[in-house]
């Protein structure tokens, strides 16, 4: 039986090449658009197959040598073999394709893509840990590609260099602990004044574990925390009084303290540029009342408030609402912002109307999108609907182009908005993750 050959047409949202052979869709790991490849099928379904590339018979001009020796085994990155500008262009095409095929809409203009450093950008990560005696001890890293096994790695180029350099010492540290078999994860969080490692422990540390942990923290200048159960069990182990984590937005004269397990943007360089773009699109003005839905710890809320607008933030996490209030007070903005805990996936038209009138919205939902929120807006076909609370402008920041496209379709086709602009934000270089931003404006009657 001859080895099958395919001509790759596009990339899917997992960074795999997409081809069609004899009426069947083939998803090929390691293949790029425009390439002719041979492949080996590893999973067969009735309508599609998943395969690995064997040989590249005709290579794309955008194919490049991966920058990390672990690429192809480690599952942390999916498209290091695609030249950096090609990654951004592929993500732009994914966004446009989703908007059209899912939302049945197109953006009136495409925004220039936002991108920054290709390496060392990832300031938060969850590293898997496994004690495997036959592999020489402890593994610390991301999962292997398409596997639940931990990749055997000694560095990671998307992590900041000082964190990458800790991978081998972390292996050695875990190997010295009494609970090396009961420590499945180390969560890394990098702030401007500190780096924190959170040890996820399934059993309590023993007294003899303190000495190696303290020696490690002192030698490498990090804080070591522990987490025994849920997020509320996260606490410092050593030192007990460190400088703590924070990030700043100098353009807006803002500083945000945060806990290592609280949600913050993984890429602080792109976060600053993304905020500038969001403010340019939102155009907040003094005296306006603006809603920030899924506001988290106030990453967008406080820059909006700096403009002189009054901002109302809603967030599902009580801990993040508390953190947002703390940051507002720290930055002398408590008088301009109000935060409320609410499950935005249970939004209703009545609840939305009860919040009062907003001139503008900013939405930054998780991967599930904001469907209940946008559905709560009055339909254009409902002539009797009260539209006094409807925002004239919506800026939507998305981490999933499929749910953005779905929500965009609702806003455009049933809620009376125009999709004025959209563009990609390369928050996660070398991965297939697509972050994007879109601007909607209420259409004239």
From Swiss-Prot:
**SUPFAM superfamilies named in the record:** Nucleic acid-binding proteins (SSF50249), S-adenosyl-L-methionine-dependent methyltransferases (SSF53335)
Q: What class of enzyme is it?
A: transferase
Record lineage: Bacteria, Pseudomonadati, Pseudomonadota, Betaproteobacteria, Nitrosomonadales
Give yes or no: UniProt keyword DNA-binding: no
- NCBIfam families per the record? PRK13168.1 (NF009639), rumA (TIGR00479)
* Record protein name field: 23S rRNA (uracil(1939)-C(5))-methyltransferase RlmD
Record CDD domains: AdoMet_MTases
* Binding positions ([4Fe-4S] cluster): 68, 74, 77, 156
Catalytic residues? 399
GO MF annotations, alphabetized: 4 iron, 4 sulfur cluster binding; iron ion binding; RNA binding; rRNA (uridine-C5-)-methyltransferase activity
Indicate whether Methyltransferase appears among the record's keywords: yes
- Indicate the family of this protein: Belongs to the class I-like SAM-binding methyltransferase superfamily. RNA M5U methyltransferase family. RlmD subfamily.
Q: Describe the reaction catalysed, as an equation.
A: uridine(1939) in 23S rRNA + S-adenosyl-L-methionine = 5-methyluridine(1939) in 23S rRNA + S-adenosyl-L-homocysteine + H(+)
State the InterPro entries in the record. 23S_rRNA_MeTrfase_RlmD (IPR001566), MeTrfase_TrmA_CS (IPR030391), NA-bd_OB-fold (IPR012340), SAM-dependent_MTases_sf (IPR029063), TRAM_dom (IPR002792), U5_MeTrfase_fam (IPR010280)
**Which positions does UniProt annotate for S-adenosyl-L-methionine binding?**
265, 294, 299, 315, 343, 364
Q: Which UniProt keywords apply?
A: 4Fe-4S, Iron, Iron-sulfur, Metal-binding, Methyltransferase, rRNA processing, S-adenosyl-L-methionine, Transferase
Question: What is one process in the GO biological process aspect for this record?
Answer: rRNA base methylation
What task does this protein carry out? Catalyzes the formation of 5-methyl-uridine at position 1939 (m5U1939) in 23S rRNA.
Its Enzyme Commission number(s) read 2.1.1.190
Q: Which residues form the TRAM domain?
A: 1-55
- Recorded coiled-coil stretches: none
């Amino acid at each position: 039986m001859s080895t099958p050959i395919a001509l790759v047409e596009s990339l899917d949202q997992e960074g795999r090449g997409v081809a069609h052979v004899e009426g069947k869709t083939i998803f090929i790991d390691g293949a790029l658009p425009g390439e002719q490849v041979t492949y080996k099928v590893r999973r067969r379904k009735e309508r599609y197959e998943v395969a690995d590339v064997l040989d590249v018979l005709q290579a794309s001009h955008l194919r490049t040598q991966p920058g990390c020796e672990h690429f192809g085994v480690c599952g942390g990155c999916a498209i290091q073999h695609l030249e950096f500008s090609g990654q951004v262009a592929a993500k732009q095409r994914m966004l446009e394709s989703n908007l059209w095929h899912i939302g049945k809409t197109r953006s009136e203009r495409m925004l220039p893509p936002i991108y920054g450093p290709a390496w060392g950008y990832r300031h938060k990560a969850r590293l898997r840990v496994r004690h495997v005696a036959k592999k020489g001890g402890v593994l610390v890293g991301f999962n292997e590609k398409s596997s639940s096994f931990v990749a055997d790695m000694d560095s990671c180029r998307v992590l900041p260099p000082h964190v990458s350099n800790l991978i081998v010492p972390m292996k050695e540290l875990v190997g010295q602990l009494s609970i090396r078999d009961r420590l499945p994860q180390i969560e890394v969080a990098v702030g401007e004044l500190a780096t924190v490692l959170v040890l996820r422990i399934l059993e309590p540390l023993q007294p003899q574990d303190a000495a190696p942990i303290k020696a490690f923290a002192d030698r490498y200048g990090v804080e070591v925390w522990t987490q025994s159960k849920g997020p509320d069990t996260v606490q410092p182990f050593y030192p007990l009084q460190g400088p703590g984590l924070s990030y700043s937005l100098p353009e807006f004269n803002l500083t945000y303290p945060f806990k290592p397990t609280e949600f913050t943007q993984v890429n602080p360089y792109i976060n600053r540029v993304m905020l500038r773009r969001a403010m340019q699109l939102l155009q907040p003005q003094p005296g306006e009342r603006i809603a920030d839905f899924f506001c988290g710890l106030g990453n967008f809320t406080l820059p909006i408030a700096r403009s002189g607008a009054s901002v109302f933030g809603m967030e599902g996490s009580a801990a993040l609402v508390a953190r947002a209030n703390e940051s507002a007070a720290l930055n002398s903005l408590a008088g301009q912002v109000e935060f409320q805990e609410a499950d935005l996936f249970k939004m209703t038209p009545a609840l939305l109307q009860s919040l009062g009138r907003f001139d503008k919205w900013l939405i930054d939902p998780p991967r599930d999108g904001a469907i209940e929120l946008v559905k709560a807006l009055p339909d254009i076909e409902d002539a009797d609907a009260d539209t006094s609370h409807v925002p004239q402008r919506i800026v939507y920041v998305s981490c999933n182009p499929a749910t953005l496209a779905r929500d965009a379709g609702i806003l455009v086709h049933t809620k009376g908005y125009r999709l004025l602009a959209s563009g990609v934000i390369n928050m996660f270089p070398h991965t297939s993750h697509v972050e994007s931003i879109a601007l909607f404006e209420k259409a004239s009657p």
